[in-house]
């Protein structure tokens, strides 16, 4: 057991050292998962997701290296790189789509985050209203007062704030009331359970009604099956994200999603045509 623990510790240290070098050597890259209108398939924006291609290990799973980065100061360097690269690439798109970037708890309580984002927006010439910062409930409650201060400063810049993984943290309703949020993202764990668990379905319905009452847009995360999409459409959801609507793609492939001056996902085009033919 001790030997196994020692092996894991050495592996963690190796990954941390390699990640530090990866930032400097340009081994990180971004992929973008579309967020789309459920009824039309029109893409409204993309979420930036960081990937790491190690020269020896190959593709390192985000679930492996991101937690290690979050446990060290490396998440600040990784986070800054992601913000700058996402804004730089989004500024080159031919349509003014939203770009969503996740911010960790460590970044959120960093007193310099708002200034960093302001500097990056000026550097990349990306309009502030196109940048959406995603924060989790866990990040918000790690240091509520500093998180609130940072979010208020971002709001002054014109940046949109979204609560990610809604329902998985603590005191969700109080967080919605106390923090300056512009959007709610329902966690995948609720979406995948809507048909097998009546409670999950009830929670998803309740969140939509809550957001409607507060005037907050809501987006369903992790939609992977036609049944899940059908449920969301039936319940009045308008926006979703997930592999059924589109897998993450590199920046070079975003242009191919443009179709007759309206951005439609390839899988959605087929569905829309099929539904139209059936009517």
Kindly label every feature range from the protein language model:
Residues 3-126, 136-139, 152-153, 166-168, ...:
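Bacterial c-di-GMP phosphodiesterase EAL domain
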Residues 67, 117-120, 149-152, 178-180, ...:
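Glycine-rich, phosphate-binding/catalytic loops in enzymes
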Residues 1, 67-69, 189, 193:
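A short, mixed-charge helix-start or loop-turn motif at secondary-structure junctions
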Residues 38, 55, 104-111, 130-145, ...:
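EAL-family c-di-GMP phosphodiesterase catalytic domain
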Residues 76, 148, 226:
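Conserved catalytic core of two-component sensor histidine kinases
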């Amino acid at each position: 057991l001790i030997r196994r623990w020692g092996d894991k510790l050495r592996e963690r240290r190796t990954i941390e050292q390699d990640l530090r070098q990866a930032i400097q050597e340009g081994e990180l890259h971004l992929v973008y998962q579309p967020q789309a209108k459920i009824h039309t398939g029109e893409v409204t924006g993309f979420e930036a997701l960081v990937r790491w291609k190690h020269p020896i290990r190959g593709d390192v799973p985000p679930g492996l290296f991101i937690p290690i980065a979050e446990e060290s100061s490396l998440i600040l360097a990784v986070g800054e790189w992601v913000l700058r690269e996402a804004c730089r690439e989004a500024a080159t798109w031919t349509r003014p789509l939203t770009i969503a970037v996740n911010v960790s708890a460590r970044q959120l309580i960093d007193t310099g985050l708002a200034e960093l984002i302001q500097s990056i927006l000026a550097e990349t010439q990306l309009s502030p209203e196109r940048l959406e910062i995603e924060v989790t409930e866990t990040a918000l409650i790690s240091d509520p007062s500093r998180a609130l201060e940072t979010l208020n400063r971002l709001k002054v810049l014109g940046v949109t704030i979204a609560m990610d993984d809604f329902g998985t943290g603590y005191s969700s309703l109080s967080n919605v009331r106390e923090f300056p949020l512009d959007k709610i993202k329902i966690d995948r764990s609720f979406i995948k359970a809507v048909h097998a668990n009546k409670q999950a379905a009830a929670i998803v319905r309740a969140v939509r009604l809550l957001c409607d009452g507060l005037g907050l847009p809501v987006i369903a995360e992790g939609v992977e099956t036609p049944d899940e999409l059908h449920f969301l459409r039936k319940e009045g959801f308008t926006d979703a994200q997930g592999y059924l609507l589109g897998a993450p793609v590199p920046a070079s492939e975003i242009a191919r999603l443009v179709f007759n001056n309206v951005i439609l996902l390839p899988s959605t085009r087929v569905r829309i045509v099929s539904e139209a033919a059936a009517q």
